Amino acid sequence: MNQAHRAPMAFSPAALLALLLALVSHTHAAEPVPGPAKPFAERLAAADVVNGRVVFGRCRTCHYPDKGAGHQNGPSLWNVWGRQAGTQEGFAYYSQALKDSRLVWSPEILDAWLADPRGFIPGNMMMSLGVPDPQERADLIAYLMQFREQ
């Protein structure tokens, strides 16, 4: 058969639209529909500390949770619970916004902070955009809860 004389394949607009809709509906059918996040207490009770350590890998550029590790680009996270934000001794780079916030770190406050650091305290200097996944935040917080005085 001579390829030079083959007529181009033609599709009707309706056939193209049907094909496009089938592809789009198939693609979106596999994606879960996000619902409201479970309450923090439920997420924390189901937290995976091992995954929290993995999630903390994103934070390690600026923070260390280990006792005696000191500060990096961000303050040490050792024994952060119950401490007023912006008051870690030896860390000089807190934003005025964080110092003025007067918030005290708790697991619930950290969950809200990590959901949207820039929106939670506008003007703070944290480089990260946070941890958008609610369960990953709970996993991370459960991991960080290990790093405190007993």
Regions picked out by a protein language model, each given a short descriptive name:
Residues A30-V55:
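Electrostatic cytochrome c docking/interface patches
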Residues L23-E31:
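Signal peptide processing junction and immediate N-terminal pro/mature segment
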Residues G52, F56-P65, L140, L144:
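The canonical Cys-X-X-Cys-His
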Residues V49-R53, Y64-S106, S128-G130:
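Gly/Gly-Pro-rich "capping" loops immediately C-terminal to redox-active cysteine motifs
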Residues P13-V24:
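Bacterial N-terminal signal peptides
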Residues V104-Q150:
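C-terminal capping alpha-helices of c-type cytochrome domains
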Residues M1-A10:
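N-terminal secretory signal peptides that target proteins for export/translocation
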Residues S12-P13, Q72, I121:
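Short, solvent-exposed loop/turn segments at the edges of secondary structure
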